[in-house]
Curated annotation (Swiss-Prot):
GO terms for molecular function: heme binding; iron ion binding; oxidoreductase activity, acting on paired donors, with incorporation or reduction of molecular oxygen, reduced flavin or flavoprotein as one donor, and incorporation of one atom of oxygen. Its cofactor is heme. The keyword rRNA-binding does not apply. Heme binds at residue 432. It comes from Oryctolagus cuniculus. The gene is CYP2C4. Its EC number is 1.14.14.1. This is Cytochrome P450 2C4. Belongs to the cytochrome P450 family.
Length: 487
């Protein structure tokens, strides 16, 4: 057969298969925009701001609708009621991890974040238990975060009040906390090995949020054969995994089963004591890789956005500093017990997380069995997108949601006010493993910075742009410089 004729025939077959798939199950799934053959709804979605496109679809199709990402149907849940009903009320049914091709290529079915079924349950249970035993949310981890906060302050002093881009320094602090818990070791901010690791972690979070990665995740089989930044991401991931494997080998040589020092030691001991197929060197490397990714860049991006918002709103920063002066003073480090006495600071940190909407569409979920949801039938294995933007920016819960206002989390008496709509860490069975650690880091790092420095912008606050430069997988703040003026 002529090659051209064969290609045309193949494309026609794909077209017919696509149309058949879309029409055969169309009546069962929730409504949604009409997909194009093969490519689905990708041309109707702004890959630079997927969340915005989903909001527009929800205005037409309601809080539960279907989009086709390529030939694959994905059900989207928009708004607090739909998201809570799925992730909390039907938590077991919606506890699957949806497809995320670039991550699956890196993790190969291992680890904590992108696994399913028994592998996920075993790894999540072990990770939570181990982190809690090392004091996640308790005293010993708090000591480590306080130590790192002091190191961060000293590093900021070295800027000598000169203009600087805080990206790297703010990335080092949470990464060092993770290193302390996982590797029983923190790094100097000038350590070359540490610098290389930070560069790759930082680059990968930017790549993950790029429009190209959104396209790649919908057509991985095709785009694997083309050059692109997904190749850089995979190269960076290999570097990080090799770094972790070297640390694992060092731990194996010094392992004392009666005195585990960190997460890696605990994992190696479990491997020795139990003949469990879930616990292998490969799964250890990916578990640590997941903890690095989840525990470093999400917190550092939030910190970076925090300082930008405080530069934009100097009156908010000044009021936080007044509360720090009143409750903590200048002669001791902030501690977690202070938070309950600092309602305004607590409200500011919550409002930062709400406003920046770090993970607009959350990590993809999947249904673990056939589910009837609001009179729609969702087949087992269907990917689910939960719009966290629609929850965090809900107008009923947060009047003027596009405005940065700590009052969203304060009552009339100025006391801190909780909200069920506060879901920056997702909700339900797939809720972020490191939520407690992240909350602690944000409070202790930010209060330590504001206890010691006045933040000074290089431009007038009104001229600062706080719009995310990319709003894909993660909301990435624009680059900026500031001066840390010692108090």
């Amino acid at each position: 057969m002529d090659p051209v004729a064969g290609l045309v025939l193949g494309l026609c077959c794909l077209l017919l298969l696509s149309l058949w798939k879309q029409n055969s199950g169309r009546g069962k799934l929730p409504p949604g925009p009409t997909p194009f053959p093969i490519i689905g709804n990708i041309l109707q979605i702004d890959v630079k701001d997927i969340s915005k496109s989903l909001t527009k679809f929800s205005e037409r199709y309601g809080p539960v609708f279907t989009v086709y990402l390529g030939m694959k149907p994905t059900v989207v849940l928009h708004g607090y009621k739909a998201v809570k009903e799925a992730l909390v009320d039907l938590g077991e049914e919606f506890a699957g991890r949806g497809h995320f091709p670039i991550a699956e290529k890196v993790n190969k079915g291992l680890g904590i974040v992108f696994t399913n079924a028994n592998t996920w349950k075993e790894m999540r249970r072990f990770s939570l238990m181990t982190l809690r035993n090392f004091g996640m949310g308790k005293r010993s981890i708090e000591d480590r975060v306080q130590e790192e906060a002091r190191c961060l302050v000293e590093e900021l002093r070295k800027t000598n009040a000169l203009p600087c881009d805080p990206t790297f320094i703010l990335g080092c602090a949470p990464c060092n906390v993770i290193c302390s818990v996982i590797l029983h070791n923190r790094f100097d901010y000038k350590d070359e090995e540490f610098l290389k690791l930070m560069e790759r972690l930082n680059e990968n979070i930017r790549i993950l949020s790029s429009p190209w990665l959104q396209v790649y995740n919908n057509f991985p089989a095709l785009l694997d054969y083309f050059p692109g930044i997904h190749k850089t991401l995979l190269k960076n991931a290999d570097y990080t995994k090799n770094f972790i494997m070297e640390k694992v080998k060092e731990h194996q040589k010094l392992l004392d089963v009666n005195n585990p020092r960190d997460f890696i030691d605990c994992f190696l001991i479990k491997m020795e004591k139990e003949n469990n197929l879930e616990f292998t060197l490969g799964s250890l490397v990916i578990a640590v890789f997941d903890l690095f990714g989840a525990g470093t860049e999400t917190t550092s991006t939030t910190l970076r956005y925090s300082l930008l918002l405080l530069l934009k709103h100097p009156e908010v920063a000044a009021r936080v500093q007044e509360e720090i002066e009143r409750v903590i003073g200048r002669h001791r480090s902030p501690c977690m017990q202070d938070r309950s006495h600092m309602p305004y600071t607590d409200a500011v940190i919550h409002e930062i997380q709400r406003f920046i909407d770090l993970l607009p569409t959350n990590l993809p979920h999947a249904v673990t069995r056939d589910v009837k949801f609001r009179n729609y039938f969702i087949p087992k294995g269907t990917d689910i997108i939960t719009s966290l933007t629609s929850v965090l920016h809900d107008e009923k819960a947060f009047p003027n949601p596009k405005v940065f206002d700590p009052g969203h989390f304060l009552d009339e008496s100025g006391n801190f006010k909780k909200s069920d709509y506060f879901m920056p860490f997702s909700a339900g069975k797939r809720m972020c493993v490191g939520e407690g650690l992240a909350r602690m880091e944000l409070f202790l790092f930010l209060t330590s910075i504001l206890q010691n420095f006045k933040l000074q912008s290089l431009v007038e606050p009104k001229d600062l742009d706080i719009t995310a430069v990319v709003n894909g997988f993660v909301s990435v703040p624009p680059s900026y410089q500031l001066c840390f003026i010692p108090i």
